[in-house]
Amino acid sequence: MRQFKVSHPGEMIARDLEDMGVSGRRFAHNIGVTPATVSRLLAGKTALTPSLSIRIAAALGSTPEFWLRLQSNYDLRQLENQIDTSGIVLYGESNEQQQNAQEH
């Protein structure tokens, strides 16, 4: 199984806010969500939603698509680290290779 380490978008936002000297509470107030929501996001404990991505993009000068791509990439890597695909036969291989894989 392949292992990938990709940062949660919230962790990236946390670093950006720290660099700018902006607290999570202040950021939450600015984007119109609860401090608890931002706290969970910055800790990587909750996914970035489309609604949050719009608000975050407006506050940080980026696009919602950018943040959603980061979240999607993070989610995909997490699943790739959890799902064992070693027993799945690749279609399109020669019949002999498929039969050998099925026998093992």
From Swiss-Prot:
User: What does UniProt list as this organism's lineage?
Assistant: Bacteria, Pseudomonadati, Pseudomonadota, Gammaproteobacteria, Enterobacterales
Q: Which Pfam families match?
A: HTH_3
GO annotation terms (biological process): regulation of DNA-templated transcription
SUPFAM superfamilies under this entry? Answer: lambda repressor-like DNA-binding domains
Q: Tell me which UniProt keywords the record has, alphabetically.
A: DNA-binding, Plasmid, Toxin-antitoxin system, Transcription, Transcription regulation
Could you give a GO molecular-function term held by this entry?
protein heterodimerization activity
What role is this protein assigned? Antitoxin component of a type II toxin-antitoxin (TA) system that counteracts the effect of the HigB toxin. Binds to its own promoter and regulates transcription of the higB/higA operon.
- CDD domains the UniProt entry points to: HTH_XRE
- Output this protein's name: Antitoxin HigA
Query: Site feature Interaction with HigB: at which residues?
Result: 3-4
| NCBIfam families reported in the protein's UniProt record | antidote_HigA (TIGR02607)
Keyword Lipoprotein annotated:
no
The organism named in the record is Proteus vulgaris
Oligomeric state and partners? Forms a complex with the mRNA interferase HigB which inhibits the mRNA interferase activity. The heterodimer dimerizes to form a HigB-(HigA)2-HigB tetramer that is able to bind to the DNA.
Residue ranges of the DNA-binding region?
24-43
Q: Give every HTH cro/C1-type domain span.
A: 13-67
